[in-house]
């Protein structure tokens, strides 16, 4: 069992790139397909606290439930926002990665490099062609 967990959406390029950077460090993480298996309320609250971000900062804005529920309005409490995320997991921004070095919302995907315990084993180029790690495993940006 890995000591690294990624809350992953395989339909998201940022999430796929993040997962591949974890694997490029020689680690096979625990992959939680959070749209199929959403975190519990307690798990979600812990992730938010561990990331040191606000509940609203974890909200995904470019999805239907955000518009339909009127979440752009600043009238909802954190508890209400959590309820919406639990009812509509697509509202949870991703990928979230948990390692022994910290928990981060990995947007952009190379943020994961800040919390991986092991160095990159090889060059890494994101799906869009952007080179992030050179041939020696050194971060480029």
From Swiss-Prot:
What GO molecular function annotations does the UniProt record carry, in alphabetical order? arsenate reductase (glutaredoxin) activity
Cited CDD domains: ArsC_ArsC
Q: Note the PROSITE patterns from the entry.
A: ARSC
Record site feature (Important for activity), residues: 8, 60, 94, 107
Q: Which UniProt keywords apply?
A: Arsenical resistance, Oxidoreductase, Plasmid
Known catalytic reactions: [glutaredoxin]-dithiol + arsenate + glutathione + H(+) = glutathionyl-S-S-[glutaredoxin] + arsenite + H2O
Mind telling me what this protein is named?
Answer: Arsenate reductase
GO biological process terms held by the UniProt record: response to arsenic-containing substance
Q: What family, per the record?
A: Belongs to the ArsC family.
Under the heading InterPro entries, the entry gives:
Arsenate_reductase (IPR006659), Arsenate_reductase-like (IPR006660), Thioredoxin-like_sf (IPR036249)
């Amino acid at each position: 069992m890995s000591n690294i967990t990624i809350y992953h959406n395989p339909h998201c390029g940022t999430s796929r790139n993040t997962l591949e950077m974890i694997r490029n460090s020689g680690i096979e993480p625990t992959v939680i397909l959070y749209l199929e298996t959403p975190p519990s309320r307690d798990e979600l609250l812990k992730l938010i606290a561990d990331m040191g971000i606000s509940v609203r900062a974890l909200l995904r804005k470019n999805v239907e439930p955000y518009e339909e529920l009127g979440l752009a309005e600043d009238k909802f409490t954190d508890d209400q926002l959590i309820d919406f995320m639990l009812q509509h997991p697509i509202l949870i921004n991703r990928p979230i990665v948990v390692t022994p070095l910290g928990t981060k919302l990995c947007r952009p995907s190379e943020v994961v490099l800040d919390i991986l315990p092991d160095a990159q084993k090889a060059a890494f180029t994101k799906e869009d062609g952007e080179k992030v790690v050179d041939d020696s495993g050194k971060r480029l940006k």
